[in-house]
Amino acid sequence: AASDVYKRQEFDYFKYAGNDARFNVPIDKTHQYYNPVLTGFYPDPSLCRVGDTYYLVNSSFTFFPGVPLSTSKDLVNWTPAGHVLDRTSQVPLKGQQVSAGIFAPAISYNKKNKTFYMITTNVGAGNFFVKSKDPSKGWSEPIYLKKIDGIDPSFFFDDNGKGYIVHNGPVVGGADYEGQRAIRCFEFDVKGDSIKGDFKEILRGGTHVEARPIWIEGPHLFKKGKFYYLMCAEGGTGGWHSEVILRAKNPMGPWEECPNNPILTQRTGLDPNRKDPVSSAGHADIVEDGKGNWWAVFLACRPYEEDMYNTGRDTYLLPVTWKNGWPEILAKNTPISTVGEKAGLKPAGKNEFSGNFSYVDNFDAADNGIGLKDLNQRWMFLRDFTDCYKVENGKLNMQLLPGNIYKREPMSAIWARQQHGTFSAETEINFTPRNDKEIAGLALLQKEDHNFVLGKTMKNGKLMITLTRAEKNNVTIASAPIKGGKLKLKVEGHDRYYDFYYAEEGGDWQLLAKGVDASNLSTQKSGGFIGACIGLYASSNKE
């Protein structure tokens, strides 16, 4: 009878479909691809190549497991490969707000000791790295680097085996203006897994310092020919975002600015009314394919109006061209196109990362991948993992924890990304609330105080379906009486406006609320850094 707490709420399936107009352009998948290559909340991409395989990581903030890892043979067709931080001991997240946690991971491979390194910042615990000889077999416990004051650390391993860490930090002597930051460089003792000596401030403020640049961050060091290159994001991860580059004969500088900076941006020189706009491009990483071709991955967004997007920051791919010893990711005043060209692509099976796609998760063995116990990798937990569910006989059974979506505490919910502006998500629940506080159903999350809950509950002892919208304050905007039995729930998104439906057992879909303003799920409204997530959610709401 002990497992009966898991029987309180049952989800039968989860169905998702994305249908954005911009991806309804037919392509030849042997030499064309859709941007973004990782759709939805996959920000701050970093990658490395080992042999013929590319390894890519993204930020995960307070979701667990942390730092999704994807692999590819061609940079376009990506396969989920687990998470770097899959044990709570590696990534303490307790009590952190949604957009804290893990910022901007960077992945590197040291050829000398044949070891992968992933270094990142946990806002609540400090800067650290983990390492692995074989990512498919897991990663080490965290090694914290207390000397790093700042965010966005990244490793560089030179041909001679020497190690370096670059990161964003405060300006030595204090900032002269808001947003002024610096890039620092440390030498790294590879054998001792520790930082050597003190840092050097290698870039102060950014490029074109006379223009008072802001938020220089996301630095990566790499080498080509006789030059070392320092590539950074600049302008902040919004509409003014960009990528800039400098070069030097030594990883500690002195640095020469590229005369063509920024080498990637969507901030100026573009028609604001252009079709299928892409915004906020920056935070890039760069890789060579082993045949002399260079490619960049970076984050950008698909706004539905001005600076609003619910899908978060996606991962894009573009070729890099070299001229006079400098790389360029995108020519000035060029809009990022939805379709990219790359020869020799090998699409295999179904791509649930790029373009329009749909999936049904039946919570059966076929769905269970490498991720949370007995669940497909698409599912994430928020903050420290709580053993609140069991997958049995093709059902997801969930107990009702007292925590809820509005608080920074453990709750019964698993989350998948909203990957399209035009989408639908549905589930069927089998749940009987015992009082007016208990609720279970579908949730849409951007932040603790920016979300929706579409759920089955009770009001004055009568069964109800309710829709609650949070934008700072929680407001129940629609409700309807329902009978007992199973209940289907569905949300259909149309960029800014969402429609919410329900269907009683054996009955047709009923519209509960139409054209609801869902801009509360945008970072523009909420502040923060994640893309909206769709949750299977249950709470007892006990005080």
Question: Predicted segments — roles?
Answer:
Residues 7-26, 60, 326-327, 331-543:
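Extracellular glycan-recognition regions
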Residues 49, 69-74, 129-134, 246-250, ...:
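Short beta-strand segments and strand-loop junctions that repeat across beta-rich extracellular domains
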